[in-house]
């Protein structure tokens, strides 16, 4: 019918907008990462042999701000924010270790909740942000040792996003509305954030490559 045709066209347009906006957001994160890695202060934080509490806290604040930017630049739809926040939180754990990862997750998670108090996905997205921090922290040692392949990073990011979808289904009510939301956002968020994570981490890797070349 004509109504069904119009509905399908609206869905296609919306999906295109989601992918385009996520691509822009990933580009913004990569630009921020590139600018940060050119700051002597930030490079020093990453390259310290024995990181102090100050250094770890500073890194957590930096990654927390990156994650907050991802929330603000996300696309609002059906009570949720389609965003790239997982990149900042997961990268914090992988690059900085458990302390940095969990503190970043707390900063980003609390902000996400306060950003939309009482919102459809406010609690579920805040909880999933903490889970992302845990995942990054758990795999930090493997990542830092260089044993983590690009495919594994993609799988880890995808797993974090799948976890977020499950948490939304478990916490956000009514279930039918949560399921309708997941059907719209799951594929673009899983695909785009998995690819974006690789590019983002590669930008920070340049810090260590530069060190080895000196």
Residue map of PLM features:
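Alpha-helical transmembrane segments and their helix-entry boundary regions
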Residues: 78, 89, 93, 101-105, ...
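A generic, lipid-embedded transmembrane alpha helix
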Residues: 56-75
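Membrane-interfacial, low-structure loops and terminal tails that flank and connect transmembrane helices
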Residues: 45-52
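Hydrophobic, membrane-inserted alpha-helices
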Residues: 63-67, 85-90, 104-112
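C-terminal ends of transmembrane helices
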Residues: 38-44
